Amino acid sequence: MARHPLVDQLRFTRKEFMRAIRGVSAEDAVKRILPMNSLSWNVGHLAWQEQRYFLHFGQGTTLYPDIAKEFAYGAPGTTPSLDRVVKAWKDITKAADPWLEELTSEVLGTRAVSRGKEIAYTHGNLLQRVIYHYWYHTGENMAIRQNLGHSSLPEFVGNLDDAAPYRPDR
């Protein structure tokens, strides 16, 4: 079975998100330029969203309860270690991947379940929310880097045409 095209878009988006923070020092990752969050908080926040949408809603599991508390929507901005949140992000995305690989258009059209009850969103809506959310925070992270005086920043959107070109789902 071929991977769903939205999963290809997510994989590309994840790579671009991580490309945007490549080379950032531990010191710069925790700096806050108000009202923005720190770059490291943004990484933890996307780890939270992937864990919630793809592990909790998709598979009924949570790898990092602390991530679920510290980086949830509306949680206060903090300055966590970049190493800590990147490790959690890698673990969470790795755990999500097998489930994502099996997604079909039919599954994407079904409502997600939390605590035994359907929620308002389909798995497809949640997948799109994650993709778009990544791009929002990729832009925010680039703005943080510009404000910190970083130069030679990556240009976006990378190699989309080769890495994640449009293709129909069937």
Specify the residue positions occupied by each region the protein language model found:
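Short, charged, low-complexity loops and linkers
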Residues: 1-6, 75-77
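Short, contiguous alpha-helical
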Residues: 7-11, 18, 26-72, 114-170
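An acidic intrinsically disordered interaction segment
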Residues: 8-12, 103-106
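Hydrophobic alpha-helical core bundles mediating ligand binding, dimerization, or RNAP-core interactions
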Residues: 10, 14, 21, 89, ...
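Short, flexible helix-adjacent loops and helix caps
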Residues: 22-29, 105-108
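Acidic/histidine-rich alpha-helical segments that form the ligand environment
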Residues: 74-114, 121-136
